[in-house]
Structure formats: structure tokens, C-alpha cells
Regions:
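Polar/acidic, low-complexity leader/linker segments enriched in S/T/G and N/D
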Residues: 1-12
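Helix-rich interaction surfaces within compact, conserved domain-sized segments
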Residues: 6, 83-133
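Short, solvent-exposed beta-alpha or beta-beta edge segments that form flexible loop/patches at the rim
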Residues: 17-51
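Short glycine-rich, low-complexity/disordered patches
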Residues: 21-28, 78-92
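Short, charged/polar surface micro-motifs in flexible loops or helix N-caps
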Residues: 32-33, 57-59
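Oligomerization/assembly interface segments of phage tail-like spikes and tubes
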Residues: 46-56, 108-110
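A broadly used, surface-exposed interaction patch
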Residues: 59-88
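Short, cationic low-complexity segments
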Residues: 77-80, 126-142
Length: 142
């Protein structure tokens, strides 16, 4: 699943604690579903909860959440755009170990589309990127 690979790389590169302690980051897929229809090709969509576990986190929790939020904006923008999804699709829990350290769990409800394209009687399977965020393309006229 490409989004989990992307998310791990983004967290590793943007969160100082994870740059120094990549072994403390775990990613799990939970409640996975395959959504498909009776279309002519076997295209489908993954729906799953990504569970991000960070053990013994001693960094700034606000930085961690801001980095995840930035990744979501680029890779699953419907969570920020939809009021219902904002309430349900980005959750966290923490076990406070002491005044400076916690185990943190972040849950993200994600989707990934996979297209099956029939070329000369054979299917070519490819993951599709998220649609462009319309607010990133916003232009004003004067």
C-alpha cells in the first residue's frame, strides 16, 4: 500500500524524534476492506485504518500532529474537506509514561484506488494518485 510507505517516509523526514529513532515507529493496517463493483475491469479501492504507533515519544506532540495533518492534506484531503470525516477519520490516543515521554497511537481512515486497465486483452494494474486539491490550484484575478 503506497500511502503507508509515503506516510512512513514523510514522518521519518519531518519529525526530528523519528529521524533519530526510526525503530520506534510502527505502522499497521486495521479494519481493511476491498471495495469493488461489477464494472468491466477488476478495479477496486482499499479502505483501511492506518494505525501509527510511536513508542517512547519525547518530541513535541504538536509538531507530530502538524506533520501528519500536512501529509493528510496532500494524500487524503477529503478528511480535511469534509466536516464528518474531520470528526471521525483522524484520531489519537496516548499513554503518558512520564513528564516528557509517551506512547502515541494515531488512527487515520485511508483509501487507495487501484485501476485495472484492459490493454490488448491483458490487465495493467496501477495505483492512482489522489485527485489534486482544488485549493492548491486556486487563483484569483484582480
Amino acid at each position: 500500500m503506497k500511502k503507508l510507505t509515503s506516510l512512513r517516509g514523510y514522518l521519518d523526514s519531518k519529525v526530528p524524534f523519528l529521524k533519530d529513532n526510526p525503530e520506534n515507529l510502527y505502522l499497521f493496517v486495521e479494519n481493511g476492506r476491498i471495495i469493488s463493483t461489477l464494472e468491466e475491469t477488476p478495479s477496486f479501492e482499499y479502505e483501511y485504518t492506518a494505525n501509527i504507533i510511536i513508542e517512547h515519544y519525547s518530541g513535541d506532540q504538536n509538531v507530530l500532529i502538524a506533520v501528519v495533518n500536512d501529509w493528510l492534506r496532500k494524500n487524503q484531503s477529503d478528511i480535511s474537506a469534509n466536516p464528518t470525516k474531520r470528526q471521525q477519520d483522524f484520531k489519537f490516543e496516548a499513554v503518558i509514561l512520564d513528564n516528557t515521554t509517551a506512547h502515541i497511537s494515531i488512527e487515520l481512515n485511508l483509501t487507495e484506488r487501484v485501476l485495472a486497465i484492459n490493454k490488448d486483452g491483458k490487465y495493467v494494474i496501477e495505483a492512482t494518485p489522489e485527485p489534486v486539491n482544488p485549493f492548491d490550484e486556486w487563483q484569483t484575478t484582480q
